[in-house]
Amino acid sequence: MIRYMSALEIKSRPFISSFIVALALTGIVSRDVCGQTKPDSRGAKSIAAIRAVLDAQVSAWNRGDIEGFMDGYWRSPETVFASGDTVTRGWQTVLERYKKSYDTREKMGTLTFSDLEIQLISKDAAVALGRWQLTRGSDTPHGRFTLIFRRTAPGWRIVHDHTSSA
């Protein structure tokens, strides 16, 4: 029997949390290891749903709708956003960070995601790796992101975001 740990249990055990993230990021837990070389229909639907979340985020961002962009994140105090040397915890705090950092349309620019790789690590969890870029009048910041998604009541949501700038 497989026992799934809650996020709180994982968070309280740093070794387990680090181990799970390491597994997810290195791809040790993959469909090939499980003996599946092609995603089944449920897996394909999950990947499509995750892509739809990311597409909706890009659309919201490019409309200047930060709250719409944040709909892709789990509305929980356990949501984590890591960037640079800063870790922000909680959906509301992440929203406030975005609003402070991108308080004008000029600062928001036009967002694109590319080189997306989405891997299911269980029926209710997935990892997405990709590139982001903002096209603005004065510059073009860009970088990489790794997102951990969880299937929640409203659908797939980002529970952990690690974004870096190039």
Residue ranges and their predicted role:
Residues 118-126, 150-155:
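A short, structured loop/turn motif at beta-sheet edges
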Residues 48, 66-121, 133, 140:
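A solvent-exposed, acidic/Ser-Thr-rich amphipathic alpha-helical stretch
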Residues 33-72, 76, 93:
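Short, low-complexity N-terminal intrinsically disordered segments enriched in polar/charged residues
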Residues 17-28:
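Bacterial N-terminal signal peptides
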Residues 2-19:
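Bacterial N-terminal signal peptides that target proteins for export
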Residues 134-135, 165:
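Short, surface-exposed beta-strand-loop junctions and turns on beta-sheet-rich folds
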Residues 142-166:
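Short beta-strand edge/turn micro-motifs at domain boundaries
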